[in-house]
Every structure is written in C-alpha cells, then in structure tokens.
C-alpha cells in the first residue's frame, strides 16, 4: 500500500485478516474459509482431475476479482508451502510474476500452466541471453518423431544469439538426426536420454514428473532419502552428461546459464536443479495450458533461479547476495520499506521459540534471542556501554 499498490493478503485466520487490514491491505482471502478450504491442495496427475482442480479454484479467483475491481494479481509473494503455492500461481493475471522465499509446509511444488505461446527468439530476449552463455535445449519430447519444429527453431535462435548449446534428445535416433543437420560448432554436443539409460542401467531414472515427497517434518528421514534418490539417480547422471560439453574456466561444473524447457513434458524439477544458481533461467515458449508441472522448491528459492513462461514468471529469492541486500538497504533508507520490529525472546526461551517456528505458531516474522543485551531499544554502541556500566554500578 505504501508503494501505491493494492495488496490482498492470503491468510489463514480471521485474526490475521484483521491485522493486515490495519497495515493497509485492500482485502484478504482466508484459506480456511469453508467455501474453498478444501481447494488448497497440490495439483493432481490425471488430465480430467486437473480440469476439476482448476474449477475448484474459480471461487477463489472470483473473490479476488470482487476485492480488486475485476482484476487478478499482477504480483504474488508466496511462502506458505506446497498446498498454497498452486492456488497462488492460479491467482496470477496474464504476464504476472510470482516470487517466493520459503515454504512453511512442504517442498514439492506443483502448478498448472497458463495459456499463451511465443517464439524461442522472444523468450531468449526476455531472458537476456548473452553471447557465450551455456544453453541446454530439450528436443523431441513426448514423441519419437525425428522432426521437432519448435526444437529446430530454438536451435537457430540460440545460434543467432551466440549461445553455447547442448541438445538433449529423448532417443538415439533423434540425436543422430540433430547431428546430421550440420549445425557445426553452434551445437557443442547432443546427449540422448536413451543412451544415458543404457549406460547407467537401473541406476538411472528419468521420471515423468518429480515424484511426490514425504512430509519433511513428520517423515524427515524418508524425505531426505527421497531427495537423495532424485539427486543420485536423475541429477548426477544427466547433469554429468550435459556438463562435460559446457565446462569452461569460469564454469567448471558445466552448469547451463539457460535451459529451454518444453511444455510437452515435466522435467522442471531437473531443470531448476541443473541451471546455474543465482543467475540461471529456465524458459518455455510453448503453451503450457492445462498441464501440471512440478519442482523442488528449495532449488528455486534458495538458489534464486527464475522460470520464465510466455505469460507468467516464477522467481525465487533468498536475499543472499550483495546486490539484493544493498537494494533493500536503499529502500529502507528511502522510506519505501518499513522494517517490522522483531520478537525478542530471552535466552532461556530459545527452545520454545524454535518449537513455535517449527509448528508455524510463532507470533512474529523475525525472532531475536537476547543473550547479553541489558535492554531492548538501544541504538548505538555508546548506549550499550552506558547500560552495561549502569548495571555493573548497581551490582556493586
């Protein structure tokens, strides 16, 4: 509200709705409202179930439009976790951006793609591909056909932009076809998923989507094992096959700077784990309408990767680089951001504070444990020394 935006909060209680109203929110949508409380779920697998899932979210979209004069969200800021994320993405208006910085309940994220398509050239411009950057392209997904018109167009677009390209094909025959087209040095290498499977045998898995994961809080050991299996059986074999073609002096692991994803399959979990941390972009150019996509949330938010689609963007943020911290400090100094006072707890209450955060029952956004401060509200080192001196004098 302070920046001239109309903010609607997605909350979990009437009390939180009242609180954000006092902070200037234009409205709120309570996830626990009986009209749609059962709609906040992950996206199902089957196409017919996906259509029903989307219809179940229409009342939420209608409520958003009612509170905003008929509009959906241009921007969504999310951190609530795997059951709220899909509806948060559904609330996005055309060409909207969703950014998220955490997940309080589950890391297996899913969403339904939106309408709209564009050209590979347009998406490379949006992603600001620079000459010399490493690019991975999926070719021939969802088909055994040798000819992939969009894939060939994307190869030409990357070649024109000066990218260092590796192509991943579904089959050996597709690999041989791409190699026969005479792209020369424009295509550094062509990797067949079929060949990786043949070499690695039972140790390689190329899943149709990111497998559902156990609850990280209640089944921690099983959750960690599921993550490890995905890394060992999918990421390492595939990443190694791609990386050997893209390694350079400043990129020894061969991370792609940009990955051209395809709407016809769901390899988003692999792509968002493989693309370069902090600057990597995963882009789509085809229509993703009515299809489900899945990814492992920490790889996007903690590594600040971006997913660029024809009519939507997902951006992870973790406030862990110097540029973002400097920009935040500038905005605070200019009065554009107001820093909420932290909840201060004494040292002996640290276990209870940790438990409250784990259970998602904590009261404040930030907690500070007071180990040695004589009182709160001190603004300088001199004030701190004065308070310490006063305490020492009183002790005598």
Regions flagged by a language model, labelled:
Residues 2-83, 138, 159-266:
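Adenosine-nucleotide cofactor-binding segment
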């Amino acid at each position: 509200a302070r920046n001239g935006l109309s903010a609607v909060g997605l909350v979990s209680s009437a009390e939180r709705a009242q609180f954000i109203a006092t902070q200037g929110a234009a409205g709120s949508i309570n996830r626990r409202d009986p009209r749609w409380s059962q709609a906040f779920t992950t996206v199902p697998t089957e196409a017919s179930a996906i259509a029903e899932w989307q219809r179940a979210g229409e009342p939420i979209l209608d409520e958003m439009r009612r509170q905003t004069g008929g509009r959906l969200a241009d921007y969504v800021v999310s951190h609530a976790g795997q059951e709220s994320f899909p509806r948060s993405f559904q609330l996005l208006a055309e060409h909207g951006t969703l950014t998220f910085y955490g997940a309080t309940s589950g890391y297996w994220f899913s969403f339904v793609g939106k309408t709209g398509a564009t050209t590979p050239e347009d998406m490379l411009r949006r992603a600001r591909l620079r000459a010399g950057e490493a690019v991975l392209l999926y070719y021939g997904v969802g088909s055994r056909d040798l000819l992939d018109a969009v894939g060939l167009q994307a190869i030409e677009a990357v070649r024109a932009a000066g990218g260092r390209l590796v192509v991943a094909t579904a089959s050996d025959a597709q690999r041989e076809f791409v190699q026969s087209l005479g792209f020369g040095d424009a295509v550094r290498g062509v990797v067949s998923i079929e060949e990786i499977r043949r070499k690695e045998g039972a140790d390689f898995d190329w899943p149709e989507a990111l497998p559902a994961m156990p609850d990280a809080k209640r089944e921690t050991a099983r959750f960690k094992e599921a993550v490890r299996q995905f890394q060992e059986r999918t990421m390492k074999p595939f990443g190694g096959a791609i990386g050997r073609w893209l390694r350079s002096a400043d990129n020894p692991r061969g991370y792609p700077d940009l990955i051209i994803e395809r709407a016809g399959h769901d390899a988003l979990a692999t792509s968002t784990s493989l693309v370069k941390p902090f600057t990597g972009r995963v882009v789509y150019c085809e229509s993703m309408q009515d299809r489900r996509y899945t990814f492992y949330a920490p790889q996007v938010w903690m590594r600040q990767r971006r997913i660029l689609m024809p009519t939507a963007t997902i951006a992870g943020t973790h406030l862990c680089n110097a540029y973002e911290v400097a920009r935040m400090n500038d905005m605070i100094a200019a009065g554009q951001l107001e820093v909420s006072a932290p909840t201060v707890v004494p040292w002996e209450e640290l276990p209870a504070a940790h438990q409250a955060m784990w259970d998602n029952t904590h009261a404040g956004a930030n907690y500070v444990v007071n180990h040695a401060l004589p009182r709160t509200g001190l603004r300088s080192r001199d004030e701190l020394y004065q308070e310490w001196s006063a305490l020492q004098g009183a002790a005598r």
